[in-house]
Curated annotation (Swiss-Prot):
Alphabetically ordered keywords of this record: Activator, Cytoplasm, Repressor, RNA-binding, Translation regulation
The organism's place on the tree of life at top rank: Bacteria
Lineage: Bacteria, Pseudomonadati, Pseudomonadota, Gammaproteobacteria, Alteromonadales
Gene from which this protein is expressed: csrA
Family annotation (InterPro entries): CsrA, CsrA_sf
Subcellular location: Cytoplasm
Protein name: Translational regulator CsrA
Naturally occurring in which organism (per UniProt): Pseudoalteromonas translucida (strain TAC 125)
Cellular component annotations (GO), alphabetically ordered: cytosol
Amino acid sequence: MLILTRRVGETLMIGDEVTVTVLGVKGNQVRIGVNAPKDVSVHREEIYMRIQAEKSNPEPGNA
């Protein structure tokens, strides 16, 4: 895992088209902004895990 230090207002690049900007820090929470092309999915980990679980175990009638 690459670990980086950024201050509020600073940005990091992921590849050529994705940017992650630190918008604010309050206590133990960090607000970040992600700019990515529309074809790149961006999710919080807990949402991504729920999506993956739903793909593995679709509810009856939702297939």
